[in-house]
Amino acid sequence: ACLARGETCKDDCECCDCDNQCYCPFDWFGGKWHPVGCSCAHANKYFCDHKKEKCKKA
C-alpha cells in the first residue's frame, strides 16, 4: 500500500504515483528520517523520472 497526498511519510518511495514526493518543510535535520512535518506532496515532472529510478526495487 502506498500513501496518498497529505499523509505522513519517511521516504519518497512510500508515496503513491511518481509525481508524489515526501516533502519535509519542517525537517531541519536534512534527511527524510525525521518523522515530524513530512508528508506526501505534489512534485514536478522531472522528479517523476528520479523517483522511478530511485524506487525501482519497490
Curated annotation (Swiss-Prot):
Tissue specificity comment: Expressed by the venom gland.
Annotated keywords: Disulfide bond, Ion channel impairing toxin, Knottin, Neurotoxin, Secreted, Toxin
Entry keyword annotation includes Secreted: yes
SS bonds (residue pairs): 2-16, 9-22, 15-40, 24-38, 48-55
Gene Ontology CC terms, in alphabetical order: extracellular region
Localization of this protein: Secreted
Cell cycle as UniProt keyword: no
UniProt GO MF annotations: ion channel regulator activity; toxin activity
Chain's role: No toxic effects on mice at dose levels of 5 ug per mouse. May be toxic to insects.
UniProt free text on domains: The presence of a 'disulfide through disulfide knot' structurally defines this protein as a knottin.
Family to which this protein belongs: Belongs to the neurotoxin 09 (Tx3-6) family.
Protein name: U8-ctenitoxin-Pk1a
